[in-house]
């Protein structure tokens, strides 16, 4: 980011504080999807677990014997550790990285600022986003915008369908919004390097 700083005139920082929705495909692409239950408890892990996670983040179908060679454990030990991480909610899914453009879909980011959302309305918003056929990922944020939504759509009409649905359910609450289209992906990771250095 520092290399680009002289060219950046304005930027916004949004800090994610809670997920609303998190899917691999929008419901318009795959009609049946059950989201994994996430366990909310603190679990311990060590450098071997982190090395296993780093390996899986780069290749989720890598054989456990190959991971075992990389991290200095037996294949049985890797299998046991992955099973434990699943049970403890550290690993919730093994997911492919999808080239949506190759499937003739586009990704849009919808940034919204809501006013006057009480707990009940936030729950309604979460339910709406989880059932919206175009929503891929949505989170509650802190910053200029308090909600960030990624839409996976075939055309701009589907973007407007989702936006109009939000306006219909929250007519007075949407105080500002911005729509961005993803042109090129520079980086996407499920396991940032800061975690692998712990």
Model feature map: region roles:
Residues 1-198:
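A compositional/biophysical signature of low hydrophobicity enriched in polar/charged and small residues
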């Amino acid at each position: 980011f520092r290399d680009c700083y002289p060219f950046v005139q304005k930027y916004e920082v949004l800090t994610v504080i809670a997920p609303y929705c998190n899917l691999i495909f929008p419901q318009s692409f795959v009609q049946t999807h059950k989201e994994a239950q996430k366990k909310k408890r603190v679990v311990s892990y060590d450098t071997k677990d982190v090395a296993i996670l780093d390996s899986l983040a780069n290749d989720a179908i890598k054989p456990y014997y190959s991971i075992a060679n990389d991290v200095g454990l037996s294949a049985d030990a890797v299998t046991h550790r992955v099973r434990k991480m699943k049970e403890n909610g550290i690993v919730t899914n093994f997911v492919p990285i999808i080239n949506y453009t190759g499937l003739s879909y586009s990704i849009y980011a919808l940034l919204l600022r809501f006013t006057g959302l009480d707990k009940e309305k936030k729950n309604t918003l979460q339910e709406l986003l989880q059932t919206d056929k175009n929503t891929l990922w949505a989170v509650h944020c802190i910053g200029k915008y308090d909600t960030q939504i990624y839409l996976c759509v075939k055309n701009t009409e589907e973007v407007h369908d989702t936006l109009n649905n939000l306006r219909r359910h929250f007519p007075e609450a949407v105080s500002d919004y911005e729509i961005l289209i993803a042109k090129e992906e520079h980086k996407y990771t499920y396991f940032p390097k800061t975690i692998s250095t712990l």
